[in-house]
Amino acid sequence: MALDCLLLFLLASAVAAMEETLMDTRTATAELGWTANPASGWEEVSGYDENLNTIRTYQVCNVFEPNQNNWLLTTFINRRGAHRIYTEMRFTVRDCSSLPNVPGSCKETFNLYYYETDSVIATKKSAFWSEAPYLKVDTIAADESFSQVDFGGRLMKVNTEVRSFGPLTRNGFYLAFQDYGACMSLLSVRVFFKKCPSIVQNFAVFPETMTGAESTSLVIARGTCIPNAEEVDVPIKLYCNGDGEWMVPIGRCTCKAGYEPENSVACKACPAGTFKASQEAEGCSHCPSNSRSPSEASPICTCRTGYYRADFDPPEVACTSVPSGPRNVISIVNETSIILEWHPPRETGGRDDVTYNIICKKCRADRRSCSRCDDNVEFVPRQLGLTECRVSISSLWAHTPYTFDIQAINGVSSKSPFPPQHVSVNITTNQAAPSTVPIMHQVSATMRSITLSWPQPEQPNGIILDYEIRYYEKEHNEFNSSMARSQTNTARIDGLRPGMVYVVQVRARTVAGYGKFSGKMCFQTLTDDDYKSELREQLPLIAGSAAAGVVFVVSLVAISIVCSRKRAYSKEAVYSDKLQHYSTGRGSPGMKIYIDPFTYEDPNEAVREFAKEIDVSFVKIEEVIGAGEFGEVYKGRLKLPGKREIYVAIKTLKAGYSEKQRRDFLSEASIMGQFDHPNIIRLEGVVTKSRPVMIITEFMENGALDSFLRQNDGQFTVIQLVGMLRGIAAGMKYLSEMNYVHRDLAARNILVNSNLVCKVSDFGLSRYLQDDTSDPTYTSSLGGKIPVRWTAPEAIAYRKFTSASDVWSYGIVMWEVMSFGERPYWDMSNQDVINAIEQDYRLPPPMDCPAALHQLMLDCWQKDRNSRPRFAEIVNTLDKMIRNPASLKTVATITAVPSQPLLDRSIPDFTAFTTVDDWLSAIKMVQYRDSFLTAGFTSLQLVTQMTSEDLLRIGVTLAGHQKKILSSIHSMRVQMNQSPSVMA
């Protein structure tokens, strides 16, 4: 109450500006003690004001004497921090014309001066009497003067004048009055300054504020919100003008949540049973249905037991409950497809956002145990968040029992500690056709044929009788397609046109009929030039083979002759000269060999020889997609004459480059231009005759492999991942056969197109690893920069880069792919990685990695580089895995490789975690933090009781993420069982 009264007082007192008096002669009861010079000038006398109060005044009237210069100096006046001073003077002046015989020197005005100083410097003995040290304020003239008649009638006409001066910076000042021939009386002098008063405005208190140094000055005053009020938007402030008045309000305060305004000067707490949710709300409101606020100042009403409020529900909305289960389920089974229909729940919980989730479980024949359905089961329109009471489920196993739980959920189901209400239905599927073939690979191609291979479907659902292949030219539609059949999982398609791209699909057939066609994949026949080039490359090999055959026959004849003559010539001298051996190089005669562009005397000649110059008018830049070592990378389009427009990636050379930077930039084009393989990034050409200089390559829609895998964690099958690895290995096989060593093979340098085809890229860094000083991936070794985690030990120690060291790097890429882009060696330092490798430690298998693939990784990581497989062997091994998917069923474990020490990414010590947030951060699943907390899993003890159905219910739908979280929960449960105190 006292505070409210104070605020009301401040508000009422804000009507007028405040004046603080520094000196007022009207209040003096003794002599003023001012200094006059000369003594015959100003005279202090006692008098009466208009109210007959006794006052001390000064008067002067030497009008009959010429050359008057009478000074009156006040005592020292302390300015008290004021910057501008006001002086109010009340005085009377005799009219000169009313004085008889007055000389012409009679005046009716006087001058006002001031002098700043930090201390008292003027006394009666040491006063200064000249205009020099003073600053003149003004010449003061009377508005009215009095005459002899007025004087006789005691009618004094009093003048009041106010003058201001400033800015002042010293501690105080003196005032001086100069008379130079007037007959006047200085009745009173009041010296004061102005300030803006304390005020309450917009629920904020503003303190007393002095005016500025100038009459036009505006002084900012920051306001303070009254109790239980808060600022809105910008900081609240007012401006104090030169007249001591408030103006230009900026910002405001309002009563905070739980408080409402009272008389515009106070914020009162909302009473029990009411609430105010935000500052913006006008006043308190009654609690909505199924909620209450037992105490005052409630910003929100809490829901009663069994009722909840969704995160997106405003506080004004009533609390609601969870729905009951769906009703009256109807199922329709068609081979391996099912249609489920049901009626909505009887109770919706008071909400209209009811949706449905389908939980699929595959069971044993006796239904005593069930497990989560495979990831390839398809739900139409979707599995989670269904808005209609119908779903179509396909790609189920044939002759298999299933249980489907249909959950009813609404916006508050995640708030309930209990699982959603559901209804279950048990179903057994019928005989079905095989599933789709996952992928196809090109074995070889001629001008008029293509040879393809593929693995059998993951769900054959019986014995595969044969395969049907559908193909057509890409420029046509599938209505013009042709068909071919094969008894095996390979086929040669003949009768094709040279240089054409064909779209191919394949499907398997069992006694139940044909399965669905596989996804569309594109393959191209050779052009006439390709065929002749291949023939030219193979001709020397054929000739060499024929020559070798002739030599072999001649050798046999010669040996027989020598043997027949051996006895006759046994006594002849034995030749003592040794045969001379000459090395002719590793490549077979006629094989295309990579040429280092830096062996050219003029590197620009290599660009002209290996890269096609493109007119810049054929190139259209669209958007920035990244930044490279030399400049920005763009997505664009290329339209060459006579060819269709295609999307391309455009690397540019930034402005201000040196000639060396230009050569280094274009060297990558000189390297890429020598390669022609479906798993090597294709160079379209270069632009060197205009600015900026550009390297134009094919556009890869899915970007770098490592980030692509992380974005799609758990969404690819093992056979799809093996298909990606096979493509990378095929590209590296091609490079190794050309005697090209990549040196920087890693998932970040593999690009992925829209068909999941992987292509080796980034040939610019392979020569200049030592020049990179910024990327932490590349660590110093022997004066250079090396990507330690991907590099073979001999390359780290001795900079010995070979195709065998690329094989080591390929093993790391395999590990990256099977772990969906996880960082090799995790958070180990580069030096720890080097030490571990030297001690023969190797990476363990990623989660759910087939044992055959991990064994291939270990083969690639043999310490003896000569013991590592060649890329041709790796391609053959992967092809066998693709043809026989059963070989990938066995999952690798650390204990399965006793002869090889493996690094063990230590399981986090769950006893060190105190919150669910800490645990999710440790296992890199922090994106699900809100889902866990919203669903009520707020402690680690509750988390250890979670199942796969719980994860699905809270929104963890990716299989890879589910496995990772469930594996961590299992480890946590084991640790907690071993340390019971953790559960406390």
Curated annotation (Swiss-Prot):
GO molecular function: ATP binding; axon guidance receptor activity; protein tyrosine kinase activity; protein-containing complex binding; transmembrane-ephrin receptor activity
Its EC number(s): 2.7.10.1
Chain ranges of the SAM domain: 911-975
Locations listed in the record: Cell membrane; Early endosome membrane; Cell projection, Dendrite
Key words of the record: ATP-binding, Cell adhesion, Cell membrane, Cell projection, Endosome, Glycoprotein, Kinase, Membrane, Neurogenesis, Nucleotide-binding, Phosphoprotein, Receptor, Repeat, Signal, Transferase, Transmembrane, Transmembrane helix, Tyrosine-protein kinase, Ubl conjugation
SUPFAM superfamilies, sorted: Fibronectin type III, Galactose-binding domain-like, Growth factor receptor domain, Protein kinase-like (PK-like), SAM/Pointed domain
First and last residue of the signal peptide: 1-17
Domain named Protein kinase: residues: 619-882
Domain Fibronectin type-III: 322-432, 433-528
Sequence motif PDZ-binding, location on chain: 982-984
Name by which UniProt lists this protein: Ephrin type-B receptor 1
